[in-house]
């Protein structure tokens, strides 16, 4: 245990995802040794992201305006929506340059163990977008893990009565993995080999 401010910093850093006690301590001591101007830049970046960044009113992606840049882009294909769990998945798919449609970010995945059900996700917003009638295909690009598969199955069953083409990214993505960590080639091939879901 360290005194006051140092221990408080370590504790707060340790609350970040993927940062354990040892990493929190290393980061804290790095910040203590850093130039004051460097620490101020970090603080300003943290404050700016909280003040300026919001979620897109259309798709749920991160944005600094009411709509994200993808929703504002008139060159995107309005007939295809790719459903992902988190904004980081949009970034991963965009890196492939394979997809030119629109996105819908759910804000997570169905996880009974974590107490997350369909009502906790942006499913109603997805259904509202689809009811507008422009979309002909929905690509379910949830993570290839238990929660992602449960979410994709739930959505496929929900969408079936709408008569839309519902596809899932092809295998090639490791089961239990996250889209964020897939390389561009693997993710690109998964897009090319997506398959229809029949439930």
Swiss-Prot record:
InterPro entries: DNA_Rcmb_RecR, Rcmb_RecR, Rcmb_RecR_Znf, TOPRIM_dom, TOPRIM_RecR. A zinc finger (C4-type) spans 56-71. One of its GO terms (molecular function) is DNA binding. Residues 79-174 form the Toprim domain. CDD domains: TOPRIM_recR (cd01025). PANTHER family: RECOMBINATION PROTEIN RECR (PTHR30446:SF0). Belongs to the RecR family. May play a role in DNA repair. It seems to be involved in an RecBC-independent recombinational process of DNA repair. It may act with RecF and RecO. This is Recombination protein RecR. It comes from Thermobifida fusca (strain YX). The lineage of its organism: Bacteria, Bacillati, Actinomycetota, Actinomycetes, Streptosporangiales. The gene is recR.
């Amino acid at each position: 245990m360290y005194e006051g401010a140092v221990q408080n910093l370590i504790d707060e850093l340790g609350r970040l995802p993927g940062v354990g006690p040892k990493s929190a301590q290393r980061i804290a001591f790095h910040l203590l040794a850093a130039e004051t101007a460097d620490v101020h830049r970090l603080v300003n970046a943290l404050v700016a992201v909280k003040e300026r960044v919001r979620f897109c009113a259309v798709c749920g992606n991160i944005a600094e305006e009411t709509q994200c840049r993808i929703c504002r882009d008139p060159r995107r294909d309005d007939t295809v929506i790719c459903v992902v769990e988190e904004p980081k998945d949009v970034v991963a798919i965009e890196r492939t340059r394979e997809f030119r449609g629109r996105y819908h970010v759910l804000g997570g995945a169905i996880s009974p163990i974590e107490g997350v059900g369909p009502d906790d996700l942006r499913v109603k917003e997805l259904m509202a977008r689809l009811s507008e009638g422009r979309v002909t295909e929905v690509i379910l690009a949830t993570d290839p893990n238990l929660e992602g598969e449960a979410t994709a199955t739930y959505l496929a069953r929900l969408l079936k009565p709408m008569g839309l083409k519902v596809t899932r990214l092809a295998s090639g993505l490791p089961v239990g993995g996250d889209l964020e960590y897939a390389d561009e080639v693997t993710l690109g091939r998964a897009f090319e080999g997506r398959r229809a879901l029949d439930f």
